[in-house]
Each structure stands twice: as structure tokens, then as C-alpha cells.
């Protein structure tokens, strides 16, 4: 073990050996490195650092869009029902929501954990919330006559369109195949970009918006889709299963969740089981891992001065935490760009 490292003050490092073509570095975070902003959240996800200092997020189990103030006080912005999962600010300042339709839940002393499609499943959908009034509009429920089953994460491009993942739903004896889609913010156009994708979760754009990154949950793989233009992918030939370029896969059992991109182009992937944030350098295929005390570390966003503060959801324990970050996050369209 070694303490400190250039750019990572206060972190404790444990170096691991080179595995195949990837260099895995484990960084164990000590308690003084993060601040708990809010507790008692019902499986928080999808944080957005707003300009007023508040954090907008969803509570999947509670079915709400929630605002967390810097004091930790929580306000319900909208009652959405189902399973609001990922959010993004779009043109006009409205909040676009990926709603997966709901989960069954397992609750124990560690907190909440989503499981199967529930009897109360309300269908997958993209919703739009007016942040001033809390009014909710359903924008999309299907693509080419096929229902959305479990929309998960979302990112806007500079042209006003958005990419989102449809992870699908898992039932006791079968499950849906996932896909990645592109749609316009006004509800006029939606298309499938890649399918089948194995439970696609986090999505994010490279700084120049020429690459769409997609994280698969059960495989713990990160894929890159090269974009010819907004909503159009230059697909890789077989044996790529869906046209994406393989960037990185886990060397052990863990699962990938949502992601955010740094200003320098590195991809920060929330990692389950081995709870933490895996920081991937796409050009060299290396990864660093920062651990947090929750196996359901599900999402990360950037805010604060120079976008050098990370806000991370520890979902099983119901916490939102704040972490000083060694590099700047990427500014997002319609939010802070």
C-alpha cells in the first residue's frame, strides 16, 4: 500500500499486476475523501449537478424525480411512478427521463436491490419533466412498433438529439435483448442504432462527439460506437455482435452501470459488486478503480468549480456523496456547456 499520488491527494493505492492488454490499478478511498450529502434516498440514480448547487436525481424505488439541496434537504420535483432510471437536461431546460417501468425489490440490512420485472410493470418510456411545474409528458413508448422495455441512461448531443440505452427487463425464466437508440427531443423521430446489446446501461459522448460509449452491465464491457453524424453509426464488421468497437472488459466478476466522461476523454464507469468508479483510458485500454463503501455504486456526474467535484450515487445504502476529483469532468450540452 502507498498513500498519495500526483493528482490523487489522500487516496490509498494498491497496485495490481498487468493483466492481458489492460493495466488494472486499485485505489482504495479513505473515509475523509468524500462527504455524504444526503441519506435515506430510495435507490438514487442519474445525478445531475445543477447550476444553483443542487443535485437533481431519480429515486428508482420511490418513483420520483428528486432535488437534493446543498444542505441535504430533499424536494420531490415530480411523481413519475414506474422506475425512473437516468436523466439529462435537454433543450429548453426540461429534464428528460429514462423510465424502466419498475422493478421488484429485495430489501435487507444493506438496503435495497432491484430484481425482476414486477407485476405492476408500467412499460418502458421516455418522459419529459418541466422543472418549474413538475408536469410530466410521455415522449416515446416504442420504436417502429416495438415497445421500449427498460430505458436506462441518456445523453444529449449538440444538435438537440439524444442517445439512450434500453437495458430490457428480466423475468424469472427469460429476459429482453437490449439495444441503443437515438431520438429527437421534440418527439418527432426515434431509431435503433445497435442491437442486440447485452443489457446496455451507461451512455456518454466523447468530447468531440465522434464516439458514443456504451457500458454493458452483466459482461462489464465498455464499447465505442463511431458516429458518422448525429444518430448514425459506422458499424464494425463481424465478429462485433452489434457494430461497436471493444474498449475494455473486466478481468474478474463485476458489473458496469452508468458512466460520465472527463474533459480529457477518459470514461468514468460506475462499477457494481466491486463497488466504485472505474476510470478507463480508451486509447490505451487501461483502467484505474476507486472503491466506495457500497456494492451498488451506480452513477457519477461532475459539478462545482471547474467541474472538478464528482457527485456519486451509492444506491443500495441510499446515499449521495461528494468527492473532490483530480481532473475536470466534461461539460454537458444544455447544462453547463
Q: Where do the PLM segments sit?
A:
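Extreme N-terminal basic, low-complexity initiation segments
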Residues: 2-9
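Sequence-structural signature of mature extracellular/luminal beta-sheet repeat domains
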Residues: 25-337
Amino acid at each position: 500500500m502507498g498513500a498519495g499520488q500526483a493528482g490523487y491527494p489522500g487516496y490509498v493505492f494498491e497496485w495490481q499486476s498487468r493483466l492481458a492488454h489492460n493495466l488494472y490499478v486499485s485505489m482504495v478511498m479513505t473515509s475523509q475523501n468524500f462527504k455524504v450529502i444526503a441519506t435515506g434516498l430510495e435507490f438514487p440514480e442519474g445525478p445531475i449537478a445543477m447550476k444553483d448547487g443542487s443535485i437533481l436525481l431519480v429515486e428508482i424505488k420511490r418513483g420520483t424525480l428528486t432535488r437534493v439541496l446543498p444542505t441535504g434537504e430533499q424536494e420531490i420535483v415530480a411523481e413519475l411512478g414506474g422506475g425512473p432510471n437516468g436523466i439529462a437536461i435537454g433543450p429548453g431546460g426540461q429534464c428528460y427521463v429514462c423510465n424502466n417501468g419498475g422493478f421488484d425489490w429485495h430489501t435487507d440490512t444493506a438496503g435495497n436491490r432491484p430484481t425482476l420485472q414486477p407485476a405492476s410493470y408500467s412499460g418502458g418510456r421516455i418522459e419529459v419533466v418541466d422543472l418549474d411545474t413538475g408536469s410530466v409528458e410521455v415522449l416515446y413508448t416504442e420504436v417502429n412498433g416495438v415497445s421500449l422495455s427498460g430505458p436506462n441512461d441518456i445523453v444529449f448531443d449538440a444538435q438537440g438529439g439524444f442517445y439512450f440505452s434500453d437495458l430490457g427487463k428480466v423475468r424469472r425464466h427469460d429476459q429482453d435483448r437490449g439495444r441503443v437508440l437515438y431520438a429527437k427531443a421534440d418527439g418527432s423521430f426515434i431509431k435503433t442504432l445497435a442491437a442486440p446489446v447485452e443489457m446496455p446501461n451507461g451512455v456518454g459522448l466523447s468530447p468531440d462527439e465522434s464516439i458514443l460509449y456504451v457500458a454493458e452491465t452483466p459482461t462489464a464491457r465498455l464499447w465505442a460506437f463511431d458516429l458518422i453524424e448525429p444518430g448514425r453509426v459506422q458499424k464494425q464488421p463481424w465478429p462485433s455482435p452489434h457494430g461497436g468497437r471493444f474498449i475494455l472488459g473486466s478481468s474478474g466478476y463485476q458489473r458496469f452501470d452508468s458512466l460520465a466522461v472527463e474533459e480529457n476523454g477518459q470514461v468514468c464507469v460506475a462499477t457494481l459488486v466491486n463497488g466504485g468508479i472505474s476510470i478507463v483510458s480508451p486509447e490505451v485500454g487501461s483502467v484505474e478503480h476507486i472503491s466506495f463503501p457500497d456494492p451498488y455504486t451506480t452513477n457519477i456526474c461532475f459539478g462545482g468549480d471547474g467541474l472538478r467535484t464528482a457527485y456519486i450515487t451509492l444506491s443500495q445504502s441510499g446515499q449521495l456523496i461528494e468527492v473532490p476529483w483530480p481532473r475536470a469532468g466534461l461539460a454537458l450540452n444544455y447544462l453547463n456547456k
